[in-house]
Amino acid sequence: MAHPLIPAILDLARPIADDLDLEVVQAVFHTNQSPPILRLDIRSRVGDTGLEDCERMSRSFELALDEANIIPDAYVLEISSPGLSDTLESDRDFLSFKGFPVQVTSRSPNDDTVEQQGTLLGRDADSVYLNKRGRTVRIARSQVLEVKLIEQL
């Protein structure tokens, strides 16, 4: 369950990211840490996301966040970009990571959890497609629980 401050944080972060040609992928507020950690994952709209993008977003967002006083106590702000071990969700994710090794977790017809690894071939309205040892494997999207990047097969 998302922290109750996340909607206000996203409302503040998205226009700043837009001005920098960036997109906010997600925000997570880890309040079980001392001090709490606010992590924003960003992605460049015009190419690869680099350290410079994270630095620009960090500087701009930190000022706005402090002015808005959404988080009254001390916190740590982390700006990062999606990478390995991240879950693929959007159409852009599936296009960007086509050809990369992934692990697909799905639900079988008898309600078991099944994990398959392969090279991502793509996704359409009905299925996710993997290459497993030279064979194309089709997994119905209705059965897919999660698609994650992995380091290698």
From Swiss-Prot:
GO CC terms: cytosol
Report any Pfam family annotated for this entry.
RimP_N
Question: What's in the keyword line of the UniProt record?
Answer: Cytoplasm, Ribosome biogenesis
Disulfides per UniProt:
none
Coiled-coil stretches, from where to where?
none
UniProt subcellular location: Cytoplasm
Q: What is its main location?
A: cytoplasm
Alphabetical GO biological process terms: ribosomal small subunit assembly; translation
* Record-linked SUPFAM superfamilies: YhbC-like, C-terminal domain, YhbC-like, N-terminal domain
Output the PANTHER family linked to this UniProt entry: RIBOSOME MATURATION FACTOR RIMP (PTHR33867:SF1)
Please state which protein family the record places this protein in.
Belongs to the RimP family.
> What does the protein in this record do?
Required for maturation of 30S ribosomal subunits.
Q: What name does the UniProt record give this protein?
A: Ribosome maturation factor RimP
Q: Which organism encodes this protein? A: Synechococcus elongatus (strain ATCC 33912 / PCC 7942 / FACHB-805)
| This protein's encoding gene | rimP
